[in-house]
Amino acid sequence: MKLKVTKLEKAAILPKYVHSDDSGLDLSAIEDLEIPPGESQLVPTGIAIELPPNTEAQIRPRSGLALKHQITVLNTPGTVDEGYRGEIGVILINHGKNSFKVTRGMKIAQMVIAPVIRVEVEEVDHLSDTTRGSGGFGSTGLTSD
């Protein structure tokens, strides 16, 4: 399966897997910018992609940035639809207490290519019963007892 990538800027870095068994391709910033504490920024990557049929790209945080700097992807996972052909941008948010400097070439997120199942929506008067029912938002408790 091929992911077609166009560099929109000469200095853009192609997404790549670091290890042969990685799930996500690293995405890199194309410019320097600073994210103050509590704020978010759209970080450009300088690339556009053409996804294989019936797939999406999920933009996810990098665990090292989250743990060491409290930087994460704001709308995680960000969804890139199959038909989108514009620049891939990553919305990073700084949950830390210090400003964070994004530098050109820095790995800022990872992109996972995933299959998409499209469904036909059917309106019904009633849904089937289950043991869970409408219980949600913590209804199963916090412990594994």
Swiss-Prot record:
Belongs to the dUTPase family. The keyword Hydrolase applies. This is Deoxyuridine 5'-triphosphate nucleotidohydrolase. Substrate binds at residues 62-64, 75, 79-81. The keyword Magnesium applies. Keywords: Hydrolase, Magnesium, Metal-binding, Nucleotide metabolism. Its cofactor is Mg(2+). It comes from the Bacteria. Pathway: Pyrimidine metabolism; dUMP biosynthesis; dUMP from dCTP (dUTP route): step 2/2. NCBIfam families: dut (TIGR00576), PRK00601.1 (NF001862). It comes from Gloeothece citriformis (strain PCC 7424). One of its GO terms (molecular function) is magnesium ion binding.
